[in-house]
């Protein structure tokens, strides 16, 4: 039985919830999100908390209720605080520059890489070797960060490439003669 689904979701002040059947819509200071819950999960609001429960007590339905609770909790955190992912560029001549809705990357290719920023995401470049991806939806923020990293993933010999700020690159030793 899911222990995650039993825990209620606390709604911070400034976050409004609209429940319409299986659709949960959240509106907060950072933005708004909505999600269609699984048919086997029901949601109820009691004061400033949300409670998710399976429709009938099957084990797989409890697991689904736990998953839905985690997704709704991420939505609450997103509309109240937002999510951010930090990337670092390691390598000689590797640079990033945010211009409007485009991120221009110089990653050692014969051409610069222009990445169009999706809707609902803001990208900042505090320095030429740092990229901050910010947004309301945790999944989209992670996806955008992964797509930027995929242009030049860190290589194991010198560690050059685009890496997450907290990522440890496992190094290999160069071949000896």
Curated annotation (Swiss-Prot):
Taxonomic superkingdom: Bacteria
The keyword ATP-binding is assigned to this record: no
Pfam families: Ribosomal_L6
GO molecular function, one term: rRNA binding
Keywords assigned by UniProt, alphabetized: Ribonucleoprotein, Ribosomal protein, RNA-binding, rRNA-binding
Biological process according to GO: cytoplasmic translation
Entry-linked SUPFAM superfamilies: Ribosomal protein L6
GO cellular component: cytosolic large ribosomal subunit
Family (UniProt): Belongs to the universal ribosomal protein uL6 family.
Summary of subunit composition and partner proteins: Part of the 50S ribosomal subunit.
PANTHER family: 60S/50S RIBOSOMAL PROTEIN L6/L9, LARGE RIBOSOMAL SUBUNIT PROTEIN UL6M
Annotated function: This protein binds to the 23S rRNA, and is important in its secondary structure. It is located near the subunit interface in the base of the L7/L12 stalk, and near the tRNA binding site of the peptidyltransferase center.
HAMAP family registered for this protein in UniProt: Ribosomal_uL6_B
Protein name per UniProt: Large ribosomal subunit protein uL6
Species name: Thioalkalivibrio sulfidiphilus (strain HL-EbGR7)
Organism ancestry: Bacteria, Pseudomonadati, Pseudomonadota, Gammaproteobacteria, Chromatiales
Gene this chain is encoded by: rplF
């Amino acid at each position: 039985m899911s222990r995650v689904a039993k825990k209620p979701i606390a709604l911070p002040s400034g976050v409004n919830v609209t429940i319409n059947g299986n659709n949960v819509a959240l509106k907060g200071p950072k933005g708004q999100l909505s999600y269609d819950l699984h048919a086997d999960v029901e949601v109820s609001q009691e004061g400033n908390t949300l409670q998710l429960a399976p429709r009938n007590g099957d084990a797989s339905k409890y697991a689904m209720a736990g998953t839905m609770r985690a997704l709704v909790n991420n939505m609450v955190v997103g509309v109240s605080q937002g999510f951010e992912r930090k990337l670092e560029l390691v390598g000689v001549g590797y640079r990033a520059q945010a211009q409007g809705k485009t991120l221009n990357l110089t990653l050692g290719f014969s051409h610069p890489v222009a990445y169009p920023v999706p809707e609902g995401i803001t990208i900042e470049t505090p320095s030429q070797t740092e990229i901050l991806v910010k947004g309301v939806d945790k999944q989209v923020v992670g996806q955008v960060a992964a797509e930027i990293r995929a242009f030049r993933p860190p290589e194991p010999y010198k560690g050059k490439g685009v890496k997450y700020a907290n990522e440890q690159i496992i190094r290999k030793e160069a071949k000896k003669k």
